[in-house]
From Swiss-Prot:
A zinc finger (C2H2-type) spans 292-314, 320-342, 348-370, 376-398, 404-426. GO terms for molecular function: DNA-binding transcription factor activity, RNA polymerase II-specific; RNA polymerase II cis-regulatory region sequence-specific DNA binding; zinc ion binding. May be involved in transcriptional regulation. Keywords: DNA-binding, Metal-binding, Nucleus, Repeat, Transcription, Transcription regulation, Zinc, Zinc-finger. CDD domains: KRAB_A-box (cd07765), SCAN (cd07936). Pfam families: KRAB (PF01352), SCAN (PF02023), zf-C2H2 (PF00096). Belongs to the krueppel C2H2-type zinc-finger protein family. It is found in: Nucleus. InterPro entries: KRAB, KRAB_dom_sf, SCAN_dom, SCAN_sf, Znf_C2H2_sf, Znf_C2H2_type. Residues 49-131 form the SCAN box domain. This is Putative zinc finger protein 75C.
């Protein structure tokens, strides 16, 4: 009898142990599944698309799990709960259209990050009309100089940085040695420094002929002062390319300068003259010296080029003109970005909902809606705002400022909307 009970207990314990192991395995699988599901939900649409396309069968333990993961990734990418069928079809057509393009054309089009198949078509047709056909790099006029130079914000998928051989600061210094002006003054006597030869048969010197690029890893190695120095160097190169293009053709990429440049106005020095100036400029950055002062408002600057740009605010000078709509801009970067709106190109994209935006600053502001970030704070009461303009308007409740005046009865208002409502009474 006792032996029988012992055998029954052993059998029961064996079954209970097996059930315990099975239950623990199920819980672990469920926990892993929930963890993976949470990670999937956090992916941006662009990341989800890349995960969906790069998913491999061996990443799953069984066929059913592979199907489930593909369904989750595809759902996260296409978002059928918020996108219409027409929009989803457009996304699929655009993606496949980009994959069947020739490699060089594909890279060039993807750098503009089109959101619609029609936009991609316009880009391809535009590229085909240009001399030389397929390009491997995008010029500053096409992406905007900030997109080409820095892109410390979002880099569109497909964007590839040029390979680098030298250390970051060495390459900044090397590319200051760009142009050397010979004793003769004829156009064909302009010469490029070593590694940047300008063929005499070339009809237009472009920004790409002189630009220097960093990889994302190299950019992270630079300090704030070195990044500022790089911006100054690239701005000078950019304006030099524009001035040379103006002398030769009068137009660069459909953009016309409102004022002409001459060789006397844009003197190009030799590397021996330029390098000491560069090192002196770099040294001023460490000391915090700002020797250039605006006579109108007293603001000081580290480099003279920044002072010249700043003074346009006081003079209301707008040198850069759009040929298509005659709108003028103070800065070349503003014209470059504006030019993209005529082409239907919005290079910046919200990673949350895929919304296309033409300016990187607008993208940063838009994303605060998703992140909840409110960087602007009222020092009087501590209230915070997403937009600086809203803070300025709100601060008038503390200061009592009323900048808007009715031209009829001379009554003052703190908000423009209040003035417009009041004027309806007249």
């Amino acid at each position: 009898m006792i032996m029988r009970e012992l055998k029954a207990d052993a059998c029961l314990n064996s079954h209970m142990g097996a059930m315990w192991e099975t239950n623990r395995s199920v819980k672990e699988n469920s926990s892993q599944s929930k963890k993976y599901s949470t990670q999937i939900e956090c992916l941006s649409p662009g990341s989800a698309c890349r995960h969906f396309r790069s998913f491999h069968y061996h990443e799953a333990t069984e066929p059913l799990e592979a199907i489930n993961q593909l369904q989750k990734l595809c759902h996260q990418w296409l978002r059928p709960e918020i996108h219409s069928k027409k929009h989803i079809l457009e996304m699929l057509v655009l993606e496949h259209f980009l994959t069947i393009l020739p490699k060089g054309t594909q890279n060039w089009v993807q750098k503009h990050h089109p959101q619609l198949a029609k936009q991609a078509l316009v880009l391809v047709e535009r590229l085909q009309r240009e001399p030389g056909g397929t390009k491997n790099e995008v010029t500053a006029h096409e992406l905007g100089e900030e997109a080409v130079l820095l892109r410390g914000t979002t880099v569109a998928p497909g964007f590839k940085w040029k390979p680098a051989e030298l250390e970051p600061m060495e390459r900044i210094l090397e590319h200051i040695q760009i142009l050397a002006l010979s004793e003769h003054k004829s156009t064909k006597d302009w010469k490029m420094a070593p590694k940047l030869i300008w063929p005499e048969s070339q009809s237009l010197l472009t920004f790409e002929d002189m630009a220097v690029y960093f990889s994302e890893e190299e950019w992270q190695l630079l300090g704030p002062l070195e990044k500022t120095l790089y911006n100054d160097v690239m701005q000078d190169i950019y304006e030099t390319a524009i001035s040379l293009g103006k002398q030769r053709t009068g137009k660069i990429m459909g953009i016309e300068m409102a004022s002409s440049f001459s060789k006397e106005e844009k003197k190009l020095t030799t590397c021996k003259q330029e390098l000491p100036k560069l090192m002196d400029l770099h040294g001023k950055g460490h000391t915090g010296e700002k020797p250039f002062k605006c006579q109108d408002c007293g603001k000081i600057f580290r480099v003279s080029s920044d002072l010249i740009k700043h003074q346009r605010i006081h003079t209301e000078e707008k040198l850069y003109k759009c040929q298509q709509c005659d709108r003028r801009f103070r800065w070349s970067s503003g014209l470059n970005k504006h030019f993209m709106t005529h082409q239907g190109i919005n290079p910046y994209r919200c990673s949350w909902y895929g919304k296309s935006i033409s300016y990187d600053t607008n993208l940063q502001t838009h994303q605060r809606i998703h992140t909840g970030e409110k960087p602007f704070k009222c020092h009087e009461c501590g209230k915070i705002f997403i937009h600086k303009s809203n803070l300025i308007k709100y601060q008038r409740t503390h200061t009592g400022e009323q900048p808007y005046t009715c031209s009829i009865c001379r009554r003052n208002f703190s908000r423009q909307l209040s003035l417009l409502r009041h004027q309806k009474l007249h």
